[in-house]
A protein has these predicted regions:
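Bacterial N-terminal signal peptides that target proteins for export
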Residues: 2-11
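Short non-domain terminal segments
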Residues: 4, 16-17, 280
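Bacterial N-terminal signal peptides
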Residues: 11-22
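Compositional signal for N-terminal targeting/processing segments
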Residues: 23-288
């Protein structure tokens, strides 16, 4: 009887051990390979010189800057593939200080940091549990961002929020004021932002709504600039193209807050869009 009980207990313990091993098994990092359409000649352009670059040449250029902003089109899977490739390749040249995301807000930071600490030992976490643990906003489709988020959470450098919380946006909309600064407050900048907002809403907004939404757009840009400047360097920010552009976005706020700090801008853009040196330092063209 004792032997049977002992055997049964050993079996139970073995099952438990196998369960624990299964829950903490290491997930081998995926080696991201760029689609051939992304590596063809003339896909990447140095906008200061007009010369074409290879992906590796671009990475080497970006790695020289303490701060890099990458602009994306949120619903283009090629753009997310490029972002995954960048965070895979840039640390091979120099250590990465931090990565910041427009898709994360301050209220998520505690959960993100906790999960990131846990994932340093590469435990298996199901997608549903992971999204819940970091309170992922479903407005950013997980099928687009999930692979990038998993990579960043398993990386040794901090993954940081760069956007406003919903409560901050609601307060700003109800109590609009103005951004302070020399570059970001130029009339042409605010006019371009306003026209972009009007166009994206089909001209259906009132003048008051446009003013409020322009302020919120600039408030988001200011927060991203502050977050980028406060992050450990080298720092990399992923955001939408309108936030990334030198013409109206985060780089102007960096100039206002820290005129002596340098930043490089890469905009990932669909073929057919016009991107020049006024918008970015580099452009990487992709299919739609």
């Amino acid at each position: 009887m004792i032997s049977i009980r002992l055997t049964s207990r050993i079996a139970t313990l073995m099952v438990g051990l196998f369960f624990l091993i299964g829950c903490t098994q290491k997930i081998e990092p995926t080696n991201v390979q760029l689609d051939s359409q992304l590596t063809a000649s003339d896909q990447i352009v140095d906008l200061a010189t007009g010369k074409s670059l290879t992906p590796q040449q671009l990475v080497e250029q970006l790695a020289q800057s303490p701060r890099v902003i990458v602009g994306e089109k949120h619903d283009n899977h090629y753009h997310h593939q490029i972002e995954q490739w960048l965070v895979q390749e840039m640390p091979k040249i120099r250590p990465q200080g931090a990565v910041l995301l427009e898709m994360l807000t301050p209220s998520q930071q505690k959960g993100v940091s906790r999960v990131q600490a846990q994932m340093q030992s590469n435990p298996y976490i199901r997608d549903e549990k992971l999204q819940s643990a970091i309170k992922w906003n479903s407005g950013w489709p997980w099928e687009q961002y999930g692979a990038l988020i998993r990579h960043l959470l398993s990386s040794p450098y901090p993954l940081l929020s760069a956007n406003l919380d919903k409560e901050e946006v609601l307060f700003a909309y109800a109590n609009p004021s103005s951004i302070m600064g020399q570059y970001s407050t130029q009339p042409i900048v605010q006019e371009l932002i306003s026209k972009t907002i009007e166009s994206s809403h089909g001209g259906e907004l009132t003048a008051e709504q446009v003013v409020k939404m322009t302020f919120i757009q600039q408030l988001r840009d200011r927060r991203m600039a502050e977050s980028l400047l406060n992050a450990p360097t080298p720092a990399l920010l992923f955001a939408g193209g309108y936030h990334a552009t030198r013409a109206i976005g985060v780089p102007l706020h960096v100039q206002d807050l820290a005129p002596d700090e340098s930043v490089k801008v890469l905009i990932i853009s669909e073929r057919g869009e016009e991107i020049d040196h006024l918008h970015a330092d580099f452009v990487w063209y992709t299919p739609k």
